[in-house]
């Protein structure tokens, strides 16, 4: 039997998983790497950490699977928007990677908006003018690394999102490519025409010579160096992490929704061939591109989801591991009604307030670790409802009523029950929770001829548990109203 290696390069760790051609998980390897915070609001990664952790976990997963040379394809999924610039000749990065959470270009984005550029950028890219996306991060690098722009014009420097950088490293510098879903997150890509936008690149003074070639999500992206796995292996599937999860959740029908809970939270609504223009400040993006055909989605992005649990552990030091939060939440005093707005790096969709910062409301002398844990988990549910309310406002006729969930926090029954309660709709957790890796493994396997097409793959999607709403509507709306007042207070400061 043939096997597929799925590389999942995330914000805090790199993971690698081996699947067989029936898409059964055979092995997993994971390695965390350091986060770099040079200044408040700045977030960086050392690209060598990204590469070394990917190489180590990929080799480890293949070894643990004991697959005896039957590796047939590789798929790559990745943290999106994060920017790497490297030398074409040596492969050496010219600066740390600037991470999607980084807010250093907030003033630049504000200036561009004041100059009237946001409508054109949004119409073409589907994105809002925000530091979250790659374009202004890339401009910052070209502005602040001496000689970088001139070198880029001479073809000496290359830009890529993390997938592109990893493909370059895996292929030994033979392929400078990306896929449509990652390109769609740069704020440089015209998602209607499927090309890099010359006008936006010109506005930001970004040499187009440094941009990668854009391909379908299932396509030949290059062959790995022979020394990595004993022979050359084709890279046949690439998608940004949230789009890969959309595929892994088999959300192929317009109206289907999924939400992934990792460091952040990302909800996607499949809108099919229709590019829905959001009136509620959501993003219009590419869900996946197969056979040259683009399928679109509305997306809402929350910057802080699982990261709020990391804050409980690393910042407040009231837990030692994430799994403790569910027990604490169960033991909390619900009457306390503590509210945490975790705007540590600003507010994401649908507010888009990069300057906002977090706050805690409703503190009393009896507020302790249990109440903080409960409020932290509840904040993720509240933010998800914000996204779903905006999606329904934009595309009410097509949205289905069930939300499919995945990611680390989806393991928490308490969190998913609260999510169902606060959104007032069923929440479905799949049997296979590694949907991001599964999605890109399927893309690579389909391109290799090992896995079925979308319809047959969707028929095999299996439900592990459905969480039905149990909270009374009056309680739900009162709690959500309190959350809304807390968010408005944060934005007013």
Curated annotation (Swiss-Prot):
One of its GO terms (biological process) is glycerol metabolic process. Pfam families: FGGY_C, FGGY_N. Glycerol binds at residues 80-81, 132, 241-242. InterPro entries: ATPase_NBD, Carb_kinase_FGGY, Carb_kinase_FGGY_CS, FGGY_C, FGGY_N, Glycerol_kin. ATP binds at residues 11-13, 263, 306, 310, 408. PROSITE patterns: FGGY_KINASES_1, FGGY_KINASES_2. It is an enzyme of class 2 (transferase). Its EC number is 2.7.1.30. This is Glycerol kinase. It catalyses: glycerol + ATP = sn-glycerol 3-phosphate + ADP + H(+). Key enzyme in the regulation of glycerol uptake and metabolism. Catalyzes the phosphorylation of glycerol to yield sn-glycerol 3-phosphate. It comes from Cereibacter sphaeroides (strain ATCC 17023 / DSM 158 / JCM 6121 / CCUG 31486 / LMG 2827 / NBRC 12203 / NCIMB 8253 / ATH 2.4.1.). ADP binds at residues 11, 15, 263, 306, 408. Sn-glycerol 3-phosphate binds at residues 11, 80-81, 132, 241. GO terms for molecular function: ATP binding; glycerol kinase activity. One of its GO terms (cellular component) is cytosol. Gene3D superfamilies: 3.30.420.40.
